[in-house]
Amino acid sequence: MKDDAELLSKAREGDERAFAELVTRYQHIAWSVCMRITENQHDAEDALQHALASTWKNLSRFRGESKFGTWFYRIASNAAVALVRKRKQEKPIDDDEDGYFIQLEDTAAAFEEQLADHDRLSIALQQINADSREALVLAEVAGLTYAEIAVHQNASLSAVKVRIHRAKKKLADLLEK
């Protein structure tokens, strides 16, 4: 298995397979970051696609001051935030009341419980303000340091610490109910 530096070097030379192998290592967490920020599967897919394209296009700008994964998560987060901002500016279209429903096969009680926990977490996260939610997701899901989040959010380190602390406290309070 090749290390990130070797794959990055080949990707910078235009090797698409090396790029695919490199981003595949981090794609799951980047997807989670996009999903938590956009709160919508379709928007998360769009944000991740934008992040992949932007990462490929800007490989030459990666300076190596952080790990590649951290840089990729930051691009994914930026893409998700930009998409959310864009969606807020658009006029909402009324959904068809009949809608489309996905029926999940009842395979196990554990699966249902996991879905319920996921739904509770998603609902609770929606009740946290956007900056705090983003900081929490970047710290807990993407594994960014507080300093990296501060740079990403253009905020002080203490502001990021406060955001994450308050987000965790509010999340715990909401999940206790």
Language-model features: locations:
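Hydrophobic positions on the alpha-helical face of helix-turn-helix-like DNA-binding modules
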Residues: 51, 75, 136, 149-150, ...
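Internal acidic/polar
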Residues: 1, 82, 90-118, 145
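DNA-recognition helix of helix-turn-helix
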Residues: 81, 124, 132, 141, ...
